[in-house]
A protein has these predicted regions:
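Long, low-complexity intrinsically disordered regions
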Residues: 1-263, 270
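Short, basic/aromatic recognition patches
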Residues: 273-284
Length: 284
């Protein structure tokens, strides 16, 4: 393999991540994970990401087509959209915050209610159960039932069936058996994340593993060993004083990765520019 330069890495990053527009399912599959954000101005993160990668994409298309797509909403390194197979690797999730027996009784009652209805709006749960109100992390008051639904979704008891004007509607989620090999499952999740953000500096690889632990808190004790394995098994090269990593089978120095003769306005959540360390190395 020829010596790899920063120009090689930059061209490779743009070519592999900002690929020619395709269909919505194919774009999601190629990205592996699409980060979501509720802020609508100038548009949601998922729409700003997909508009460059899906033919004739319009704001809201992902939300509109979500029920018919083989995707789920869940937390990986951040919240977003991913395949059911990837979601299954992370469950049953064991959050660091342990619920009390009373909280579990509330969850079981709500789960029974959801199963009977098939699909529920948070408003339906609030009207059926008197859970009171809680203070959010932003200091505002919110229905306790909304926080409970969020917690049930995070724990894998519920799934997002669809959205209505941006609000998540929930359905019961079948229980997922734990992976037979947690280390292999963790490695597979690392590979997915690396495939989205590669080529990436070693410091970013470590940061992504820390974010990934929020998606699989039950494996937080495996983080150090998983990072060590990733550094050992992923292709890498030292460039301008940093160790860079990318997926197996890729060649950043390939002549296929020529500069694009086009201008793209990218949002901060876009995988091309998401990592500040890489962005500063590539573009100053």
């Amino acid at each position: 393999m020829p010596a790899i330069s920063l120009d090689h890495l930059r061209h490779h990053a743009v070519a592999r991540t900002l690929f020619p527009p395709t269909t919505l399912p194919q774009a999601i599959a190629r990205l592996g994970f699409v980060q979501a954000d509720p802020i609508r101005a100038p548009a949601r993160a998922q729409d700003l990401t997909l508009r460059h990668r899906v033919r004739d994409y319009r704001a809201g298309d992902l939300e509109h087509h979500y029920p018919a797509l083989a995707i789920e909403e869940d937390f990986l390194v951040n919240y977003g959209f991913l395949s059911p197979d990837v979601q299954a690797l992370m469950h049953p999730r064991q959050p660091r915050t342990v619920w009390s027996a009373e909280r579990w009784r509330q969850a079981e009652s709500v789960l029974e209610f959801v199963r009977a209805r098939g699909e529920v709006h948070p408003r339906d749960v609030a009207e059926a159960f008197d859970h009171g109100r809680v203070t959010t992390g932003f200091g505002s008051a919110s229905r306790a039932s909304t926080a409970l639904l969020d917690g049930m979704h995070y724990r894998g008891l519920l799934r997002v069936a669809r959205r209505e004007a941006g609000t998540r509607l929930y359905a019961a989620r079948p229980a997922t058996p734990p992976p037979a090999d947690p280390e292999a499952a963790f490695d597979a999740l690392v590979d997915l994340v690396v495939a989205k953000y590669a080529p990436l500096p070693g410091v970013t690889l470590g940061q992504l593993l820390s974010h990934l632990v929020h998606g699989v808190p039950q494996w937080r004790h495996l983080r150090a060993a998983t990072l060590q394995r990733a550094r050992a098994r992923l292709p890498s090269a030292e460039v301008d004083g940093l160790r860079w990593f990318w997926p197996e089978g890729e060649e950043p120095s390939s002549h296929d990765h020529q500069p694009r003769e086009a201008v793209a306005l990218l949002a901060p959540f876009d995988p091309v520019v998401w990592d500040r360390t890489r962005f500063e190395r590539f573009w100053g």
